């Protein structure tokens, strides 16, 4: 196994604007890291720099304790799996998986051994003589992964490999990728815009925004303790409810637009007089009643999801989304009374967006 290290790596196309801000990342031997973020955030560019397909403007890349910053892709000990499979249509599954080893001059016996082992792991044994056009999307993606496995790389690089698959097949392939990593234990760097893939596959998630790593942490950490307003809004479905306002001068209240107020706790009071953003996840609201007090949510729409429901409504000028038990189905125009437990409230700096 081998580790991967990015040391203050940056990228600029014109020498002025940095599309990747200096970024440092240590990936342990056998670790599975997922880079997630919206389109244009720089995640694929960063992956291509690790692969050697893009030049690094500054900084260094280390694989298996070797500096590979200027090395050709073929010499880095990496194998890449792409979104579009990149299979040769005129070759069989077996030939596609073996081709990279063949052009490297590996012996036929060893090639056959590696292809058979990869086919066994990926359950492609009975498909080795077929052409790509005879395979389903999931089978083609397994062939692409098999072609990477036979190389026995130090690091796997995945560039949105499940994007072309339908929803049901994506779920199946996520499970297969988890099982594959548990079996091979190869260091992996995976790019996706899909937060479900990120949260289910990763041992650690790197959330990227405009070329910056906003947060690096376990899936639980980035969900339960987002490092910034951006992470809070990007990770989670639905996104965290974010309310703009300020802490009162005496620190005792959170003052929102429209004259709405919420109590603060002792920790919040150190931010007295400052603009802040308050966040709460949809599942952390507690149903209350008018007699018990709380905040009134005027219902707009209800999304019935099966296991639970999402209530969309307004509290004054604030729009909120609340997750409800499946049997709770308020109608449009009705009022829900809610309690916001202080222990589940998140505070973000109103200027920087960073967690307070």
What are these regions (language model features)?
Residues 57-60, 110, 210, 345:
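Conserved coupling/switch loops of ABC nucleotide-binding domains, chiefly the family-specific signature
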């Amino acid at each position: 196994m081998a580790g991967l290290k990015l040391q203050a790596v940056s990228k600029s196309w014109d020498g002025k604007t940095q599309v990747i801000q200096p970024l440092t990342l240590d990936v342990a031997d056998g670790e599975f890291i997922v880079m997630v973020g919206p389109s244009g955030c720089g995640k694929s560019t960063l992956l291509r720099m690790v692969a050697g397909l893009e030049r690094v403007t500054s900084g260094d890349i280390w694989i298996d304790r070797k500096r590979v910053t200027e090395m050709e892709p073929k010499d880095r000990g990496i194998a890449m799996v792409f979104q579009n499979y990149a299979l040769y249509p005129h070759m069989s599954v077996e030939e596609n998986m073996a081709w990279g080893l063949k052009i490297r001059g590996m012996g036929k016996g060893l090639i056959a051994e590696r292809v058979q082992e990869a086919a066994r792991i990926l359950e492609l044994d009975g498909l080795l003589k077929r052409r790509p056009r005879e395979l389903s999307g999931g089978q083609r993606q397994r062939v692409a992964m098999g072609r990477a496995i036979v190389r026995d790389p130090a690091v796997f690089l995945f560039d949105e490999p499940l994007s072309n698959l339908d929803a049901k097949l994506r779920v199946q392939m996520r499970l297969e990728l988890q099982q594959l990593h548990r079996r091979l234990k190869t260091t992996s760097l995976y790019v996706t815009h899909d937060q479900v893939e990120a949260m289910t596959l990763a041992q650690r998630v790197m959330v990227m925004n405009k070329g910056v790593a906003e947060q690096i942490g376990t899936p639980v950490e980035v969900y339960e303790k987002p490092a910034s307003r951006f992470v809070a809004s990007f990770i989670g479905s639905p996104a965290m409810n974010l309310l703009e306002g300020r802490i009162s001068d005496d620190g005792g209240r959170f003052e929102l637009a429209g004259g709405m107020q919420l109590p603060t706790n002792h920790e919040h009071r150190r931010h007295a007089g400052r603009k802040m953003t308050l966040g709460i996840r949809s599942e952390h609201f507690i149903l209350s009643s008018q007699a018990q007090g709380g905040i009134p949510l005027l219902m707009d729409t209800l999304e019935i999801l099966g296991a639970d429901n999402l209530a969309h409504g307004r509290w004054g000028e604030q729009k909120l989304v609340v997750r409800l038990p499946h049997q709770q189905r308020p109608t449009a125009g009705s009022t829900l009374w809610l309690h916001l437990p202080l222990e589940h409230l998140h505070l973000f700096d109103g200027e920087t967006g960073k967690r307070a």
